[in-house]
Regions:
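Active-site catalytic loop in hydrolytic enzyme cores
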Residues: 67, 95-173, 182-191, 195, ...
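Short beta->alpha transition motifs characteristic of CBS
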Residues: 49, 56, 105, 117-123, ...
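Cys-nucleophile CN-hydrolase/nitrilase-fold catalytic domain and related Cys-dependent amidase chemistry
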Residues: 19, 28-110, 182-202
Length: 275
């Protein structure tokens, strides 16, 4: 059975607060990934508005609310035009007026918004402008002759083992981690992604922003880790980049047979984890 899927990573360099130019640029890069044969394309955290919340301040909410429908429409068109699944992280308008979540939107190959994940562990200033999420949904990806189940965690979520484990227990084979990860914590980026992949025996795809937003340096180094935690592909730290890499999902079954972490769990003695 063919279980190979081509993953597109868009290591994006944007302009803080300039939603229109960021959308135009993102569509170009999505097209580049599709031209390289990507089945699923992932953008980094808050690609459309930018991330430096100390500079955006109250504009974080006004930009997100004012441009949400525009972002959704453009990303839906990008997915449909390029016939790819697309993970587009953005502030998501909730049913409450003026309230956003820091989210990742999932579009299918027809441009339909099929689901979203709301970041649950908010970092620093994020909690002033975003509402936290409270669920870890999984999503079924259906290609012509292949299918898989994916999950999403966003940036700081990756530091909490429970995030990725929740997705693995629901059958995820790939977990995407769009991020705006700062240069001071590059070591944690490397450790967290590989460890989440290994302990759950699945693929982790980390897609980080690149560039400077004021005093915030975002270093890229987007990567794909296999179910043993090994880095299969890593993008540079010194520039924007688009890359497509093929993974074989049969590796998930193979490694879960060889190293049965999930099978050998003992939930009945983990009660302290729920406190």
């Amino acid at each position: 059975m063919d279980k190979k899927i081509r993953i597109g990573m868009v290591q994006f360099e944007g302009n803080l607060g300039d939603v229109h130019s960021n959308i135009v640029h993102a569509r170009e890069l999505i097209g580049s990934a599709a031209a390289q044969g990507a089945d699923i394309v992932c953008l980094p955290e808050l690609f459309a508005t930018g991330y430096n919340l100390s500079l955006l301040a109250e504009k974080t909410v006004s930009l997100g609310c004012a441009h949400y429908e525009y972002i959704v429409a453009e990303m839906a068109a990008a997915a449909k035009d390029n016939r790819v699944y697309l993970i587009a992280p953005a502030g998501r308008k909730t049913e409450m007026e003026g309230i956003l979540t820091n989210s990742a939107l999932l579009f299918d190959q027809n441009g339909a918004l099929t689901g979203y994940f709301d970041k649950s562990h908010l970092w620093a200033l994020e909690r002033l402008y975003y509402k936290e999420g409270n669920a870890y949904p999984v999503f079924d990806i259906r290609l012509q002759d292949r299918s898989t189940r994916i999950g999403i965690m966003i940036c700081y979520d990756a530091g909490f083992p429970e995030s990725c484990r929740s997705l693995a227990l629901q059958g995820a084979e790939i977990v995407f981690c769009p991020a705006a990860w700062r240069i001071q914590d590059v070591d944690m980026w490397d450790l967290n992604l590989s460890q989440r992949a290994l302990e759950n025996l699945l693929f982790v795809v980390g897609v980080n922003r690149f560039g400077h937003e004021g005093d915030l340096e975002l270093f890229g180094k987007s990567k794909i880790c296999n179910p043993r935690g090994r880095v299969l592909r890593e993008l540079p730290m010194d520039r924007e980049s688009v890359d497509v890499f093929e993974i074989d999902l049969m590796d998930v079954e193979r490694f879960r047979t060889e190293i049965p972490y999930l099978r050998d769990r003992k939930p009945h003695i983990y009660g302290e984890l729920l406190k």
